[in-house]
């Protein structure tokens, strides 16, 4: 018995210690019996920050949020059985949004598998193709070889999570009872440790000089170019993309998640209203570029994606440091396997300064005309959902974070988050674009990002109410703006809206919930606002005081649709007039 406890303690102690040596210092733990030894060791290790979350589905997204904000791997730990299955949605999101998670599941030992033992199921490859690596760990043994094995496996799994494309990995730990480690053992954390940590150093792909010369030569003869920036994890992309735009004269179509629309860099070449003006069919048909250079994930904007598809005669250069480039439009003619930063640096160094031409001036002109029209909604007194975004940005302090939920909030952020000299970081879950786990992800991000404001619809808010517990347990600061249109507002913009007979029951889905009581149950403050001045004041108050603050603004789905369409129609008239003026 003592040999088992000693082996368990040293073997798992070596694993936990190696995680911290590799800078995996945050773990989200859901309570359970079989995971007891790992949980206790993690709690005991001075280098590990532990976060408890009872609901595994919420816990998975909470860890995802920390990892997204910290840009470092975060560990997840749960017991065996369906607890592990509840991580699945967060693992899927992490895989497609390229976020490193270290998923740790405890398991029954081999003699208790497939024999009807309680809380035992097949956990081999549980997450299928949504993890970069699955490893079944060996049972604990008291030997130097096994302690080295624990550390080396940790090094491999963490390295894999961090290598491009980053993503989740899964370690399954079978353990036998008894499950309590012996903390009185000497040198508990030192077994298998060498003087040097086995860190896998990730290098940058260097583009061959011949290719750079060829690229620069071609670009210098392509006047009509665009730089399209989607969701990007590189903090420096704003500086380098804008420098490349200045050299080439190519406008930057900046998705809000690129974080190029705000900050202290030069935004002369940044186009922020393309989602609206690219709805103009004539413009989409007649504005044909020579080259499109794309960084990061695909943009939120559907009209931009349609525009990209129509650029059949252009050279499409997709820059992606992994072999899994993102091109749902299926138009890539050239894939450069390098980081966005390295690509920009190489091109900037050798690129001559190209003169601004009619192409870039045309994009800038239409963008400004569109923005002038869209800004008319800032005078609206009615509860327009687009104004939620502009008014939040108006009161957010420097270095704040705006987290946009999926469905309508991220689309309104795309349309109404205009360029700003304030440094505001925008986040969202755009891997598989689900409405689940949004509260939990935002709360995870708030561990690192403070202040943080989440904009979320009422259905998405309902979907992850359990996530609010993290704010109470870990004393987190967050302001949540609930845009309550009593249902699925996005469906009013889709063809389903025309099927009136079944629209409300199948798509509108009003649920008629009063969220005030549940917010107070989790120790938060709740405010239902009745005007824009009160709205701005409540958001401002939330960002300057501690704790959980929920601000609800009630809107009408039909009225919101009408206001969006009115703005689009006005913009189309302005664009048509501008295009006619240019053609004379």
UniProtKB/Swiss-Prot annotation:
Pfam families assigned: TPP_enzyme_C (PF02775), TPP_enzyme_M_2 (PF16582), TPP_enzyme_N (PF02776)
Entry-linked CDD domains: TPP_PYR_MenD, TPP_SHCHC_synthase
Gene Ontology BP terms: menaquinone biosynthetic process
Key words, A-Z: Magnesium, Manganese, Menaquinone biosynthesis, Metal-binding, Thiamine pyrophosphate, Transferase
Record field: catalytic activity: isochorismate + 2-oxoglutarate + H(+) = 5-enolpyruvoyl-6-hydroxy-2-succinyl-cyclohex-3-ene-1-carboxylate + CO2
UniProt-listed Enzyme Commission number(s): 2.2.1.9
Molecular functions (GO terms): 2-succinyl-5-enolpyruvyl-6-hydroxy-3-cyclohexene-1-carboxylic-acid synthase activity; magnesium ion binding; manganese ion binding; thiamine pyrophosphate binding
Complexes and interactors: Homodimer.
Function: Catalyzes the thiamine diphosphate-dependent decarboxylation of 2-oxoglutarate and the subsequent addition of the resulting succinic semialdehyde-thiamine pyrophosphate anion to isochorismate to yield 2-succinyl-5-enolpyruvyl-6-hydroxy-3-cyclohexene-1-carboxylate (SEPHCHC).
NCBIfam families: menD
Protein name: 2-succinyl-5-enolpyruvyl-6-hydroxy-3-cyclohexene-1-carboxylate synthase
Organism the protein comes from: Bacillus cereus (strain ATCC 14579 / DSM 31 / CCUG 7414 / JCM 2152 / NBRC 15305 / NCIMB 9373 / NCTC 2599 / NRRL B-3711)
Name of the gene: menD
């Amino acid at each position: 018995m003592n040999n088992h406890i000693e082996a368990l303690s040293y073997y798992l102690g070596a694993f936990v210690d190696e995680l911290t040596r590799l800078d995996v210092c945050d773990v989200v733990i859901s309570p359970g019996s079989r995971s007891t030894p790992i949980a206790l060791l993690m709690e005991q290790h001075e280098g590990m920050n532990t976060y408890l979350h009872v609901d595994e589905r919420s816990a998975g997204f909470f860890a995802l949020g920390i990892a997204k904000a910290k840009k470092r791997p975060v560990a997840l730990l749960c017991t065996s059985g369906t607890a592990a299955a509840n991580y699945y949605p967060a693992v899927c999101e992490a895989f497609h949004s390229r976020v490193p998670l270290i998923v740790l599941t405890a398991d029954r030992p081999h003699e208790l598998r497939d024999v009807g033992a309680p809380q035992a199921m097949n956990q081999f490859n549980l997450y299928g193709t949504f993890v970069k690596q699955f490893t079944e760990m060996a049972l604990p043994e008291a030997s130097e070889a096994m302690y080295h094995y624990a550390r080396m496996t940790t090094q491999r799994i963490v390295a894999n999570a961090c290598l491009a494309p980053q993503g989740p990995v899964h370690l399954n730990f079978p353990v036998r009872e008894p499950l309590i480690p012996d903390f009185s053992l000497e040198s508990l954390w030192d077994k298998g440790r060498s003087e040097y940590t086995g860190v896998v150093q990730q290098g940058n792909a260097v583009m061959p000089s011949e290719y750079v010369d060829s690229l620069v030569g071609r670009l210098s003869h392509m006047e009509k170019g665009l730089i399209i920036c989607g969701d990007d994890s590189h903090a420096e992309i704003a500086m380098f993309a804008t420098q490349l735009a200045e050299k080439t004269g190519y406008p930057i179509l900046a998705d809000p998640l690129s974080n190029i629309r705000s900050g202290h860099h030069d935004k002369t070449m940044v186009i922020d209203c393309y989602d609206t003006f690219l709805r103009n069919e004539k413009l989409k048909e007649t504005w044909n570029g020579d080259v499109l250079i794309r960084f990061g994930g695909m943009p939120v904007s559907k009209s931009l994606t349609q525009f990209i598809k129509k650029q059949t005669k252009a050279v499409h250069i997709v820059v992606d440091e992994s072999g899994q480039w993102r091109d749902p439009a299926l138009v890539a003619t050239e894939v450069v396997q390098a980081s966005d930063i390295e690509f920009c640096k190489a091109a900037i160094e050798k690129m001559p300064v190209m003169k601004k031409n009619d192409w870039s001036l045309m994009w800038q002109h239409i963008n400004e005309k569109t923005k002038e029209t869209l800004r008319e909604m800032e005078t609206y007194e009615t509860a327009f959902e687009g104004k939620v975004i502009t008014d939040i940005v108006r009161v957010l302090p420097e270095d704040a974070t705006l987290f946009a939920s999926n469905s309508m909030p991220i689309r309104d952020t795309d349309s109404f988050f205009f360029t700003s000299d304030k440094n505001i970081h925008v986040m969202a879950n755009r891997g598989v674009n689900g409405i689940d786990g949004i509260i939990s992800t935002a709360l995870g991000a708030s561990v690192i990002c403070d202040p943080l404001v989440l904009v979320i619809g009422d259905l998405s808010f309902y979907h992850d109410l359990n996530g609010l517990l993290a704010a109470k347990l870990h004393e987190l600061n967050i302001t949540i703006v609930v845009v309550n249109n009593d249902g699925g507002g996005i469906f009013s913009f889709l063809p389903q809206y025309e099927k009136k007979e079944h629209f409300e029951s199948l798509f509108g889905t009003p649920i008629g919930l009063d969220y005030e009581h549940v917010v107070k149950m989790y120790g938060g403050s709740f405010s239902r606002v009745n005007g824009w001045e009160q709205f701005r004041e409540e958001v401002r108050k939330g960002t300057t005081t501690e704790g959980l603050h929920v601000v609800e603004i009630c809107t009408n789905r039909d009225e919101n649709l009408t206001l969006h369409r009115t703005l689009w129609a006005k913009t189309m008239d302005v664009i048509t007039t501008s295009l006619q003026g240019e053609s004379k």
